[in-house]
């Protein structure tokens, strides 16, 4: 190689995008201590976040979005922060679609809009929610590829549970899909995202803990409408996609069967992080309803 340039310098092993955020420590002498990739920055470096680097805790005092810099100061607290984001997905193109026993699976191109709208303070060891806050940050938009599962409206509405329990079960299915799918794709759970939408209207279902003032009633799907037909999306967390979601489409029933086995094998009563998610997040009846949804689809 005779050029003065070194090709490997322009290729990151950690991130597709080179548009990283620099973390600046202002505790003593100002210095840069880390870089965070663009897709993770708003969730980990938002104002009032606790950023952990090399075992040290840092409080994020200011995030300069345009300059791609976050200013932090050392701290010592007994909690960590967890960002609350709201993801909206719009289907742009369907590459493949097939019907399974009682549901449909698809693979295609989607437009993803993600906005960090708040954060929770979670206490170490006990995992108690000890506080929260609202945030107003720019949206992160990208085109990527996605796999999605469509649950027929007649199956969803015929379940013998209350509307609240059915929605809880839907979130439970999304949770277990998000955690089981990476085992088949041989990737990290953070390499893919999950979202729930309405196949009949194209609207997205907001997470349960989203601040009320962020919601727009015109954008919310009508859960109680008989036309509401849930889509559960598992999408590549990288612009353009990196080939993860097509492998889920090829699995057909195997993915759903493994999700059902995972829930049934878990000894908990109402739900836990090993199956449909913590009870406080998944809601009442989530485990039982999630099992019924999967059984009906298979």
Regions found by a protein language model. Name each.
Residues 1-45, 49-55, 62-298:
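Extended, highly charged accessory segments
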């Amino acid at each position: 190689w005779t050029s003065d340039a070194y090709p490997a310098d322009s290729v990151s092993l950690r991130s597709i995008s080179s548009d990283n955020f620099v973390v600046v420590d202002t505790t003593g002498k100002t210095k840069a201590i880390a870089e965070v990739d663009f897709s993770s920055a708003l969730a980990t470096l938002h104002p009032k976040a606790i950023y952990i680097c090399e075992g040290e805790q840092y409080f994020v005092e200011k995030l300069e979005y345009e300059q791609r810099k976050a200013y932090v100061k050392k701290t010592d607290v007994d909690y960590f922060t967890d960002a609350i984001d709201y993801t909206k997905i719009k289907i742009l193109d369907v590459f493949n679609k097939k019907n399974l026993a009682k549901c449909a699976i698809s693979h295609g191109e989607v437009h993803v809009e993600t906005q960090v709208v708040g954060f929770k303070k979670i206490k170490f060891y006990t995992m108690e929610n000890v506080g929260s806050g609202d945030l107003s940050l720019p949206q992160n938009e990208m085109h990527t590829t996605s796999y999605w599962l469509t649950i027929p409206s007649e199956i969803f509405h015929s379940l013998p549970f209350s509307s609240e329990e059915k929605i809880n079960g839907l979130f439970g299915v999304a949770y277990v899909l998000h955690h089981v799918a990476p085992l088949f794709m041989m990737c990290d759970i953070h390499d893919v995202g999950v979202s729930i939408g309405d196949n009949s209207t194209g609207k997205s279902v907001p997470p349960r803990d989203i601040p009320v003032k962020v919601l727009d009633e015109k954008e919310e799907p009508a859960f109680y409408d008989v036309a509401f037909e849930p889509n559960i999306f598992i999408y590549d967390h990288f612009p353009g996609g990196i080939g993860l979601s097509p492998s889920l489409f090829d699995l057909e029933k195997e993915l759903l069967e493994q999700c059902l086995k995972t829930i049934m094998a878990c000894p908990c009563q109402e739900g836990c992080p090993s199956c449909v998610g913590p009870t406080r997040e998944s809601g009442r009846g989530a485990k039982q309803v999630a099992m019924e949804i999967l059984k009906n689809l298979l």
